[in-house]
Amino acid sequence: MGQKVNPIGFRLGVIKTWDSKWYAEKDYAKLLHEDLKLRNFLKKRLYHSGVSKIEIERAAGKAKINIFTARPGLIIGKKGSEVETLKKELAKLTEKEVYLNIQEVRKPELDAQLVAENVAMQLERRIAFRRAMKKSVTSTLKFGAKGIRITCSGRLGGAEMSRTEWYREGRVPLHTLRADIDYGFAEAKTTYGIIGVKVLLFKGEVLSAKK
């Protein structure tokens, strides 16, 4: 079970929490679609800003969006000019008042989503997939991760047949619910087709093991 399921979804309510924090009754579906629209827009708009996670909180007529990024300067812009433009664009997608909160990811090497996007970008630049995987694994472990596993899937190296290759170092316990495992997924659009990159990053155990 732990092998197949999304490690974050598997740990929700145990050691992980939801990215959308709001409650609704009748218009639940509408708000859910709105969330999806906002996330897709931000991912596309801030593609080069190293966005790791987007949290959405809602309260009476207001929507607070927390953006976790490795490059906050790119999003904020000179004297906050970029943020104001972004706010106006988001306000068009939702009927609510939008509040933006930009938070910096201090160690992008310890963020699974950013590691996955980094590997995907290297693959798009025609760097050999094994080299890209190894480089990311080494730098992540250097920054204090307990273990990491990177999987690349697709027409690797322009091969005729698609295949899956993975590289792991350290411990990545997928069944242990108290294990703090971060998960990231990115796609590399190469001339041979799309290559999927999955990253599982083990940061250590959260709850103390029962004696």
Curated annotation (Swiss-Prot):
It comes from the Bacteria. The keyword Transcription does not apply. Residues 38-106 form the KH type-2 domain. GO terms for biological process: translation. One of its GO terms (molecular function) is mRNA binding. InterPro entries: KH_dom, KH_dom-like_a/b, KH_dom_type_2, KH_sf_prok-type, Ribosomal_S3_C_sf, Ribosomal_uS3_bac-typ, Ribosomal_uS3_C, Ribosomal_uS3_CS. It holds the Pfam family Ribosomal_S3_C. Keywords: Ribonucleoprotein, Ribosomal protein, RNA-binding, rRNA-binding. GO terms for cellular component: cytosolic small ribosomal subunit. Binds the lower part of the 30S subunit head. Binds mRNA in the 70S ribosome, positioning it for translation. Part of the 30S ribosomal subunit. Forms a tight complex with proteins S10 and S14. NCBIfam families: rpsC_bact (TIGR01009). Belongs to the universal ribosomal protein uS3 family. This is Small ribosomal subunit protein uS3.
